[in-house]
Amino acid sequence: LIEFAHESNTFTVKTTGIQDFQNSRYVRGAEMLEQLRGTGSEIGGAIEAAARMGWEVVPILAAHANPGGPVSEIARREITEEACRLLEEGGTLDGVFVALHGAMVTESDQDGESQFLREIRAEVGSEIPVAVTLDLHANVSDELAEHAQIAVSYRTYPHVDMAARAGEACDLLHRAMGREIKPSLLVDRPPMLVGCDDGRTTDDGPMCRILEAAAEEAQAPGLLHVSVNAGFTDSDVFAAGPSVLVCHDNAESAAAQTARRLCDLIWSFRNDWTLPMSLDEAIAKLKGHKLSSKPVVVADFSDNPGGGGYGDCTALLSALLEAGIENAALGALIDAKAAETLIEAGVGGVVTLWVGGKSDPSAGGGPLKLTGEVRAVSNGSLTFEGPMLAGVAADMGPSVCFRVAGVDVLITSNPLQMHDLNQFCSVGIDPMEKSVLVVKSMQHFRAAFEPIASEVLVVDAGGLCSPDVTRRHYERLRRPVFPLDQIDA
């Protein structure tokens, strides 16, 4: 069992180093089993499947970093070399399971997953079946299909089915190891950068209908599994955008026809995509909102650390304060220096300092000079308890609740998308007691926060992850693609 997972935003000024993996998850051998058994993660699902099928498990390593810039060459080499060394020590293997993201970019290769799988293949040989899991937002290259025989992508966004999809991949791997099947992968993609409404599955949108069609197609003789990926637009790589992956058993022609039909279906929904509201619209709605027993949840799509955003943009916080919004909480604003200063002041301390906006003031607002009271401090360690990644430990780093006027600001040291109520609770903020909850997240917040919300507002506050791809300059992306180019239907 191996995990090497990262979603890389190539438009950020930052890179992702080994410390970023250590801040999230970097464990080896038996520690993998101890930390991830029984969790809603891919490795957790694989461990459960292995027990069900009676495998002798050889845990290699689990390396996961929160989304950010391309993975540094130092980090890539360390993780890859460690994985290969442990594989060599693991002895004779019958199969390999690898939890990937699908949108990893390294400093030396725009296709980080294939780069890693090349090394794994060189270590284990060409005959052993390799099964991978992929995020629904994978940018799938043709090369990945050369190194893996089995690929299963998430079918939900928010991603609440990681463990289940890992189990599905392991079922196919078990059949391949027993020589019941000889799987192969085929990948196809429409000429699109944006598609599938970014993969949202919380309503009856394009992705739900495409996934239903994929499930029906997968019933054809010779086909083993069909995955659909919405792609990741914040990565300037050749294969960015939606794709279809078909796993088949000596049925290449049927697989190719299936993939093409699904690509045509994805293309037919090309104009069905949702853009968030402007900051001004959101503030106007908050001002006019009637009091309710449930909070209004405001999601800052554009400053989502889960998409590689900086998480320190201040435009939305500034607008809340200027509008005089009361009984609100905002999380998380990532500023390690501010957190350190506030922790030194201690609970009850009243402090004036510059907060946020330090990564790139041109993207979503520069530093804000704020005066407020330190309400709570924390080392940032917590365990997710909601529908997504339940049971998985997380580390926000030194964190504080800083009350500024009517807003409790969760300030953290490490980047972490808001998708679990416990992130607020860990610093004494009760989400149910607030009138307004602001979360830096695109879609994952919905799993835990939508059930407690009176209304959900999704906002583009000008951060790095703005969904308007026409603002960006793509250099590596294949062309022509929708919506950047005119393409005849």
Question: What is the predicted role of each segment?
Answer:
Residues G54-L61, P67, M104, A131, ...:
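Cap/lid and interdomain-hinge subdomains that line or gate substrate/regulatory clefts
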Residues A51-W55, P59, R85-V96, I283-V296:
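Glycine-rich phosphate/diphosphate-binding loops that line cofactor/substrate pockets in enzymes
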Residues F4-E7, Y26, G69-T80, E88-I181, ...:
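Active-site histidine-anchored catalytic micro-motif
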Residues D197-A405, L410-I411:
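Hard-cation-handling environments
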Residues L1-R52:
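N-terminal amphipathic/basic leader segments beginning at the initiator methionine
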Residues A51-W55, R85-E88, A122-G125, S153-T156, ...:
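Generic secondary-structure signature for well-ordered alpha-helical cores
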Residues P59, W267, S381-A489:
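Extended hydrophobic packing segments that form well-structured cores
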Residues F11-T15, G69-S72, S108-Q110, S141-E146, ...:
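Short acidic, glycine/serine/threonine-rich loops at helix termini
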